[in-house]
């Protein structure tokens, strides 16, 4: 759909409406970028096509049920009216039937606006007027049974308040454009030119950062890009993230995100709200599909590859959702997690720490939840202490959509109103608000009147400007307005299409292959292809619109790959989510005619109004309680298996599912995830043996949702592990996956190097008859420690190609940090003792009884196990020195500089708190230093009277030492 302005008649009507709304405010019609509806989805574009002869039509029978239409505007702003060219509803019916929602977050509509209905006499158009409200999405919800006739909307125009006239640009000191000046100096010069309104304009969000025209501050167009450029039609769609994690191939992921970056840059988007670094520990969570899985090391390595690939083109990444968003209570999206500091630092903060310390991304998105009981949106501990002070982050923080407003009565109940919420967020360092808080008129007025914390506002503006100067955007800004219909040169390039297919192939996991049914023989006479996913491949959340023929389904792939002598017959069988059993009989008949049946089941992430489905089953706000196939899918599989025809299940899923029944009934199971546009061809490559599968599970597959939580790296229990009615073991363990060949592990060598690192080597032999990839995985277990440690932890992996009969030596290096733990004092240390070292093609076996760590290991050939005796204790040792005390003549405060040095032999964090005359003063300061590294930390001793601080003593206290200074 092309963004359009409305017809001349509508423009006249809107101008009249604007005049009646305000004598001074200016209004303009916003182009619409996209639209959706509860019914007639394919026709909804007609309500925005500048053609009064075409319409979005809702039949009278459908109006007996709730319906809706939603538009996304190209220019987010203060929406103040909607003009309808419509037929079939009276003004009174519209008053009673319609609820209008204006929102920045379509997942959280908020409250409907109060509106009036007027008819423009010259045109006959209907004008819905309401107090201006900031938003990017406008939704009309239609109550059932009020409009009695078929309703046609020929045109729907959305008016927003235009911005104020540009302030006087005379007398501006534009020396901030001088690239020879230090960046910090350029920031201060520019900041001094900005009005409070311009500072608020800089930090609002509207499909990116809008910039400030008067001062030449550039805009930054952003995109959601976790598995492809999503703000357009026809960009290359790669497998969803969880599938790419299943490849266990970080170098290949680097190439993928480099390609996504190229497609983003071509489209004029220079920042991506990606990747997701959440450690997904609950498969019920709908957003598992966006994550790299349940292990912090795997998430770290794949996350670093994602960030480095995209940033290689000079683009901006925004890692999300910081922190602990991937473990919501009960798997319910955005619910709080409530973890203690140990759990956070052992698991959920790890990928963020590793990515921010090693890749230096320019931006991060905070999460909806809380940290230690404090909403992340106001957590200085998390957003300043850990993120900035410990990890050295010096970019800008983005709020998740609506997260600042959530601190009011929407969720957290920690702020009485938006002004308090805005102040809390600014003081925590949140620079960009996806939502309507920083854009709220009262909040902006508070800034002009000094009721916002202006020091905090200046600080977040500095964060934003620092990134703009550092990336050269003032000199060369590739950002361009979004165009959802234009295709760009790199989109669907042969190289990117081939890369999408390769990543899809490498992500496929073979879970079962009884009697070596796979790969399918060329001699098979007839293949039945059955299931709702067979000819309707699902891409997952945050996917762009597709061109005709862009998506290749499994049915397409099988038809393209099967022998010319093999007949292909197809039956859908049932929908993804519907309860209609009418198609089961046809599926049974189809399967009965075939030599083998390929049944494609799984998640649905499309448009229900187009596909006739009830709802999506995976993605944001689509969480599952049962982990069972929805609708009639399980009944379809049962019926097809009952025919006696050998069944291959293709699980097209965005999370682990309960495959217990399927594992008993089918001959073979492959998981192709949500495999991207080339997924059908890639799946057929595996089915017919044109590619030897080597994907490995990035998440544990339980026997039942009743086992949850069930992660491979659990901690030992004081009592029994099993239930009365179910044992403890998963159905398919983390790291698991089969191949069409076999591998044998041998000759484990473990040696401690002079620098304290540990070298681990193992030999892997391809003992089968086909070339294949093996994913060698290194796990360690700390056998005895001063605190409880995890049963096992992944510490390395390599994906390697080995020819038949060939032996490959894989080498890993463990650092002292890899062997470390957080002791009872939360200090990171290496405790001398025994470590079990295990290398294999999946996570190790264990017996869920007493002495569980002793039972860890592999069956003969499946992996190798050894013991490392490590006798080198390690830990940080911090030394503190007051190096300077200076007086601030402006406010009378004293600035105290404390130098912190790590003279130990291990990287660790620490905290330092200042006490002035025995009273704690200011925020606790965090640090994380490598051995031999120093950091200068400044503290401010305030002066109550502004004439000098009368303090007598200063005491700086860390966890284990203090430094005292008398005046």
Residue ranges and their predicted role:
Residues 26-75, 87-94, 118, 161-167:
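Disordered, acidic Ser/Thr/Pro-rich linker "stalks" and the adjacent N-terminal cap
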Residues 65-66, 74-81, 134-136:
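Extended extracellular/luminal ectodomain segments enriched in beta-structured repeat modules
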Residues 77-89, 140:
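A short beta-strand element within beta-rich, extracytoplasmic domains
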Residues 91-106:
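Short, surface-exposed beta-strand/strand-loop-strand elements in extracellular ectodomains
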Residues 118-122, 799-808, 860, 927-935:
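Short proline/glycine- and polar residue-rich coil/turn motifs
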Residues 141-148:
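Short beta-strand-plus-loop segments that form exposed binding edges in beta-rich domains
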Residues 167-820, 831-839, 843:
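Glycoside hydrolase catalytic-domain context in secreted enzymes
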Residues 816-873, 944-967:
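Terminal connector regions
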